[in-house]
Curated annotation (Swiss-Prot):
Regions of compositional bias (Polar residues) in chain numbering: 1-19
Name of the protein described by the UniProt record: MFS-type transporter phqF
Keywords per UniProt: Cell membrane, Glycoprotein, Membrane, Transmembrane, Transmembrane helix, Transport
GO molecular function (one): transmembrane transporter activity
Species name: Penicillium fellutanum
Record-linked PANTHER family: AZOLE RESISTANCE PROTEIN 1-RELATED, MAJOR FACILITATOR SUPERFAMILY
InterPro entries: MFS_Str1/Tri12-like, MFS_trans_sf
């Protein structure tokens, strides 16, 4: 084990930037302001948790309301940073993330599933006010007012954003339609994939040409710790979100549970997330904050979060295609009396109200087999996270001071 800066400098520059020298002293924040800022941040995480846990339990009822099993994947959201001193703020946010898994079931069963969205409005308003009023740069105690409005506007990377949105839209729509609504060789699906490739190529070119001003700076993407963290985060979160979305379908379609019962039965998964599994979700943020200079941490953290959100949307759409294709295949194999179109329009809840008793057992078995095979895909995606994990540098989160400069401890 070596504790000198020379070990840090011997690493390739594209792999690990040198640790910052003379790190800025953080300016303190009054406890009452910190408390309100934590409360606003926790509300923001709570809103994200609502999108995931509420919608996962309400989606079977939503598919029944709109007579469309094809829309399972649309509910996917289209979160957390800490350093050594941030565990105290991260723990309550992680706990809040899983506290209300049954709320969506209660809304869907006793009120209306639309409240799954309405509830975000007041919470989002409170969050916005608190963050705007109390957030400041911990290094200087103020926001950066020296930057002109034009430079701030350029920093938004508007051209990249305008290209990225249709790129992701075409990919998601192609994955949702392919093999389900239309065959994979259908012209609509092919055109969507072609647009995705062309627009994606243009977006990559813009990111490369803008260099550090890009939304995703190429310099950071080439850093092994950043792309490894992004791969790990995308796979592990994508796998978890598939399980979170399809367990309620199994609970309601196979076990015949109500939305509230579904929210209760999924609590062991949520409790496991709070107690231990959530620990793995924080590893990429620890990695980039340990390996990179302080000036690069915000952008690198945003890249990891971007990979997380993108994987949620893409992998849920892919899982929907797998689920629906396998469901139709099992239904055709088990019973010739069931029309697949009738299965789509019935939705994933209250199957006994749509099908007779002589075909219902076959449909339930088909649902169970289709959900199980979707979980196989989630397991494979989780295994792919090791690709990112094994490429991370072996660094210690502890830092020592050498001649006033921060030095990384290599293991």
């Amino acid at each position: 084990m070596h504790n000198t800066q020379s070990d840090t400098k011997c690493e390739n520059a594209s792999d690990t930037p040198e640790s910052p020298t003379g790190e800025e002293e953080s300016v303190g924040l009054a406890r009452w302001k910190l408390g309100l800022l934590m409360f606003g941040n926790t509300l923001a995480v709570f809103c994200v948790a609502l999108d995931n846990t509420i919608m996962s339990n309400a989606i079977p009822r939503v598919t029944q309301t709109f007579d469309s099993l094809e829309d399972i994947g649309w509910g996917s959201p289209a979160r957390r940073h800490f350093d050594r001193q941030r565990e105290r703020t991260t723990s309550p946010k992680t706990a809040v993330y899983g506290c209300f898994g049954g709320i969506g079931g209660a809304f869907a069963e006793n009120s209306t599933w639309r409240w799954c969205f309405y509830i975000n409005l007041p919470l989002g308003a409170v969050t916005t006010v608190l963050i705007l009023c109390f957030f400041f740069d911990s290094r200087t105690g103020t926001s950066d007012v020296s930057m002109s409005s034009w430079n701030r506007f350029r920093g938004l990377d508007i051209p990249g954003l305008l290209l990225f949105l249709p790129t992701v839209f075409c990919l998601l729509l192609a994955l949702q339609w392919g093999g389900a609504k239309y065959p994979w060789n259908n012209v609509r699906v092919i055109v969507l994939f072609v647009i995705f490739i062309l627009a994606g190529g243009c977006w990559i070119f813009i990111q490369h040409s803008m260099k550090d001003q890009a939304s995703v700076p190429p310099r950071l993407i080439r850093n092994r710790n950043v792309w490894s963290s992004a791969v790990y985060m995308g796979c592990i979160v994508g796998s978890f979100i598939i399980i979170l979305y399809y367990f309620p379908i199994w609970f309601q379609a196979v076990k015949g549970g109500s939305p509230i019962q579904s929210g209760t039965m999924i609590l062991p998964i949520i409790i496991g997330l709070i107690v231990w599994l959530g620990f793995g979700f924080q590893l990429p943020f620890i990695a980039v904050q340990t390996a990179l200079p302080r000036s690069d941490i915000p952008v690198a953290t945003a890249i990891v979060t971007f990979a997380q959100n993108l994987s949620e949307a893409v992998l849920v759409a892919l899982a929907q295609t797998i689920f629906q294709n396998r469901l139709f295949a099992h239904v055709k194999q088990l019973s010739t009396l069931v029309d697949p179109n009738a299965l789509v329009h019935a939705g994933a809840a209250n199957l006994d109200q749509h099908f007779s008793a002589d075909v219902l057992p076959e449909i339930v078995r088909a649902y169970s087999a289709a959900v199980t095979e979707t979980f196989y895909a989630a397991t494979g995606i989780a295994a792919l996270s090791f690709i990112g994990l094994i490429r991370l540098q072996w660094l210690s989160v502890k830092k020592t001071k050498t001649n006033g400069n921060a030095a990384q401890t290599h293991l």
